[in-house]
C-alpha cells in the first residue's frame, strides 16, 4: 500500500518510472530478489492481456521495469526516428514493451526511447528492476528513492551505503523502517 497508494499520492510520482527502491542486499526479505517478486505482483500483476515468459526463476511480463545487468556492445537497438545503433550498457533501465512467444523474444523500450529485442537465450542480460541494490544504482538518479531500513549485515550497514542511496534521489527520499537501525549506522 505504501508503494502503490500512499507514496504516489504524497510525492506525485508514478510507481514505475519515477520511483526506485534501493536496498543493500540481493537476498532476504528486503533483498532485491524478493522485493522484485512482490512488487511485480503489486505494480504489474499477471493479466489475460499481458504476455509473459518464464526464464529461470524470473517472470518477464509486458509492462515490467527491467535493467540491463552487463555491457553488451553488439546488441542492436532501433529508435522511434528510425535510427539504429549498437550497445546497451550495465545499469540502463527500461520497460518490457512486448513478449513475442512465436519469435521467442522480449522487446524492451529503454528510457531514451531505444527499442531492443532480446532473444530468450539472452534474457540473462536483464533483470527486474522495481528494486535494485544500492551498488547497482551508483551513477543513476531517480525522482523518488525509497529505502527500506531493517537489520542488514554489518558489512552492508554503513553510513557510506546510506549516503549513496540517499544521494540517488532528486526530489524525494523516503526511508521506512525502525529508527534504531538507522541510528546505529
What kind of region is each of these model predictions?
Residues 1-87, 97:
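Conserved helicase motor core of P-loop NTPases
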Residues 90-185:
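C-terminal accessory regions
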